[in-house]
């Protein structure tokens, strides 16, 4: 029997939810070898049967699935029992338990989370706004932003902004060269929007900037990567954040998701105190 597990991901939609769940699972079992096969938009018994026949040919087959159509999900589970293949429904019990708790039947419509509702359009609008207001562009629109991120170069402003946009927040980010980088309207009214300063450890920033220069195949800019210059940049940025009473997040050992979660908490606090 092979020591490599054959993981089959079966979804009746885009598979986004399933991918995220499996990512979390495999992080817990780092020494396990596995191959992954993904089957998305699986919505018929014929499709399921073909996948199960394929899985049966492999040793150590495991199936994870997100299928909201109860009859199709039951068909898959029965096929798994028949062929002695372990099958795990990622959403089944969760939807059933929520249905009981809320005393309401679930719609069981695939891709329900992608319905073109008001929230969907708000997210699209947030993404468009954020892309147009990246890296100091259109800073005169600070009053239209839900969030404003400030920080010296390479403090994850852009990826964090894009992540926040996908969560529905119109985000504008500004590279902080000095205090003059900040729009006058924001200096006059620091609470005009929810402003968050991003900072990091100097040596970490040196490494990131050097990697950036290498990736672009550019000659090293001594001012851009000099530790003393960077320490001064960061200290000046911190002074600016303190002056205008803007909360600060150190992104040194944080993922984009962790940084964004902290920013959203700040936003919610500001909103509640608003």
Curated annotation (Swiss-Prot):
Would you say which domain of life the source belongs to? Bacteria
Binding, ADP:
151-158
Q: Which Pfam families match?
A: Kinase-PPPase
Keywords on this record?
Kinase, Nucleotide-binding, Serine/threonine-protein kinase, Transferase
Name the InterPro entries on file: Kinase-pyrophosphorylase, PPDK_reg
Catalytic activity, as annotated? N(tele)-phospho-L-histidyl/L-threonyl-[pyruvate, phosphate dikinase] + ADP = N(tele)-phospho-L-histidyl/O-phospho-L-threonyl-[pyruvate, phosphate dikinase] + AMP + H(+); N(tele)-phospho-L-histidyl/O-phospho-L-threonyl-[pyruvate, phosphate dikinase] + phosphate + H(+) = N(tele)-phospho-L-histidyl/L-threonyl-[pyruvate, phosphate dikinase] + diphosphate
The EC number of this protein is 2.7.11.32, 2.7.4.27
Name of the top EC class for this enzyme: transferase
Q: Name one GO molecular function term.
A: ATP binding
Protein purpose: Bifunctional serine/threonine kinase and phosphorylase involved in the regulation of the pyruvate, phosphate dikinase (PPDK) by catalyzing its phosphorylation/dephosphorylation.
Q: Which family does it belong to?
A: Belongs to the pyruvate, phosphate/water dikinase regulatory protein family. PDRP subfamily.
PANTHER family noted in UniProt: PYRUVATE, PHOSPHATE DIKINASE REGULATORY PROTEIN 1, CHLOROPLASTIC
| The protein, known as | Putative pyruvate, phosphate dikinase regulatory protein
């Amino acid at each position: 029997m092979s020591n490599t597990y054959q993981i089959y991901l079966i979804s009746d939609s885009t598979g986004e939810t399933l991918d995220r769940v499996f990512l979390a699972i495999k992080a817990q079992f780092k020494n396990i070898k596995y191959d992954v096969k993904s089957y998305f938009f699986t919505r018929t018994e014929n499709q399921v049967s073909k996948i199960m026949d394929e899985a049966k040919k492999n040793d150590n087959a495991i199936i994870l699935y997100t299928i909201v159509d109860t009859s199709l999900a039951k068909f898959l589970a029965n096929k798994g029992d028949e062929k002695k293949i372990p099958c795990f429904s990622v959403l089944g019990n969760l939807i059933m338990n929520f249905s009981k708790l809320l005393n309401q039947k679930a719609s069981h419509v695939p891709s329900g989370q992608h319905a073109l509702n008001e929230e969907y359009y708000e997210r699209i609008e947030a993404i468009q706004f954020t892309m147009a207001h990246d890296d100091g562009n259109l800073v005169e629109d600070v009053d239209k932003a839900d969030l404003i991120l400030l920080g010296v170069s390479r403090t994850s402003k852009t990826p964090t902004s894009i992540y926040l946009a996908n969560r529905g927040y119109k985000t504008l980010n500004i590279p902080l060269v000095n205090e003059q980088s900040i729009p006058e309207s924001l200096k006059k009214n620091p609470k005009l929007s929810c402003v968050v300063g991003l900072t990091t450890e100097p040596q970490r920033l040196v490494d990131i900037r050097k990697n950036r220069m290498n990736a672009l195949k550019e000659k090293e800019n001594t001012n851009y990567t000099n530790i003393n210059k960077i320490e001064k940049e960061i200290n000046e940025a911190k002074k600016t954040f303190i002056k205008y009473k803007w909360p600060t997040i150190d992104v040194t050992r944080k993922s984009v998701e962790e940084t964004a979660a902290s920013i959203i908490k700040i936003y919610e606090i500001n909103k509640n105190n608003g």
